[in-house]
């Protein structure tokens, strides 16, 4: 059975340059909130059984509209936090996929590392490694291995 892992890069956050508090607290912009709502509409039909996110505010906020629409809680893990190891994040995704379809929200560096790692195993993925905010990779998992994936561009704002 093929299980889908929706690996989402968080929506547009406030600019780092003007942010004086810890980066983990940096929230979405108004545009980011619109992107999060559009992502919720896009992913809602897939009805992931779980939503797992980086604990950074911008990632949790990206999944809030989807969590509300599906009436499920957002779980957080440091394994999806900015700067996390891509191999550890991929292991987490594969583990989570054993329970069915899952949505995971992370950061550009982690998403890049996961997708790059998948491609080094010989899986062909058509799409960018470095993805823009509010876009995603839908990875297809069978037997605990990624067997394919589809890039999903960010929804129009």
Positions of predicted regions on the chain:
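Short, low-complexity, intrinsically disordered N-terminal peptides in bacterial proteins
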Residues: 1-4, 154-157
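Active-site-proximal alpha-helix that buttresses catalytic centers in soluble enzyme cores
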Residues: 2-87, 124, 131-134
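Residues at the C-termini of beta-strands that transition into short coil/loop
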Residues: 9, 78-80, 140, 150-155
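Residue-level signal for well-ordered alpha-helical positions
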Residues: 65, 117-118
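Short, hinge-like loop/turn segments at secondary-structure boundaries
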Residues: 69-70, 92-95, 121-122
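Internal catalytic or translocation cores that form aromatic/hydrophobic pockets or channels
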Residues: 85-102
